[in-house]
């Protein structure tokens, strides 16, 4: 068979609309999906997609071993990396030395302006868990970022009269970090050689191609957050992509800096290896707490001894979460990079000062625990949390970071799966909360919203994933509720899901609660395999395939 030129656009199809109409900024999708940009992402896809698929297969082999009762281990093959005390990552970019408070949110125009106008140090703009990957969200997200870094977003909300423009006068503007979608995601609106393009490569490639050189001209660089990895070879894959991408644009290797989210159980056994794989490009590791909890439930779902109680009892102070944090901070600081803390998802409660004060105190305690543990910065989901979080970090970490603080802790293989929670209980309230959060988040996601306020918390896919997998594992193991003594069965949970979906749908025209309920019930009833991710489970419902775009008409 003749080899395909990796940069040719033969056998490439675009099935999403490539509009020439601006929405809330100056650029349009036609400025993003140019022929040269398309060639660039197609080259990366053709070069690396087979490796990506093999690594996803490897995840399933790990799951099969865990299902058979095996345990996770530190890898023998990479012992030499862990035990070598001498190697360190290259120094990070000067603009990333101080990351005390990071704000996160999807790349829609309003969120981008609000984030840049908040006096945080860094802003993670998110194509992943806080963004429903509709074609419009993804392509206009790229448009918005292109215009934001060039200071070309300026619009007025007609309904409120509020003007949205980034304020750059006399202040330090937050440094932007981009999170592409994870390795498990594809985008069905672009086909390469008959298969959907890797969503990770699409998100990374379009942003890097259009913006890397401009960012360098501003004294910045292309910075990324890398999500959902489960093996150090997945980090090696990112490193290989970074090297090729930089070579293609004639940018020095090591220019890109990337922070890896440690949000899966298997990769917590390979932290040294992840940093080593990305040592020229690393900006540290981050504790993705909710996804980590979800991954722990998912990977250990067939081991009854690891069933977790109601989600509100699974805090950062329980053994397996505490041990993962200690391990991450120790290894990051040993290798000379940042160890970032997790998300405070609280939303200020404007109409109840007493409840709001209690919520802010909980945030303060959470951030105090993080900074005293040794974290170099933390995440917030709402600008209203900035004063609370910042005051804690300024008081206890007056330096830009605390990488110099080395803690001598030894975490064993068993410590990372110590899911014993004294007095942990599974209750009707916990069941109901999981159903309510799961349904409401899934329904919003199906309508194109990936970041949803529920019960005074800003929920993204990670918290809904915890709900989904807890319901599944409680049903699978026929757990008895501690408060009622009733056994949790698929029939019982399905009935509750239907009742809650009906309640939620009342007075909400054009809602998608039935689709959400059906998806949730299929897994619980064993009619389908447990999906690796909610986003892959629901993705086909948001795909909007249109007429094939004439590629010769692109810029």
From Swiss-Prot:
Record InterPro entries: Malate_synth_C_sf (IPR044856), Malate_synth_sf (IPR011076), Malate_synthA (IPR006252), Malate_synthase_CS (IPR019830), Malate_synthase_TIM (IPR001465), MS_C (IPR048355), MS_N (IPR048356), MS_N_TIM-barrel_dom (IPR046363)
Class of this enzyme: transferase
Keywords, comma-separated and alphabetical: Glyoxylate bypass, Glyoxysome, Peroxisome, Transferase, Tricarboxylic acid cycle
GO MF assignments: malate synthase activity
Gene Ontology CC terms: glyoxysome; peroxisomal matrix
The name this protein goes by in its record: Malate synthase, glyoxysomal
UniProt induction comment: By ethanol.
NCBIfam families: malate_syn_A (TIGR01344)
Species name: Pichia angusta (Yeast)
GO BP annotation list: glyoxylate cycle; tricarboxylic acid cycle
Annotated pathway: Carbohydrate metabolism; glyoxylate cycle; (S)-malate from isocitrate: step 2/2
Alphabetical list of Pfam families matching this protein: MS_C (PF20659), MS_N (PF20656), MS_TIM-barrel (PF01274)
Localisation per UniProt entry: Glyoxysome
The EC number(s) this enzyme carries: 2.3.3.9
Family: Belongs to the malate synthase family.
Superkingdom of source: Eukaryota
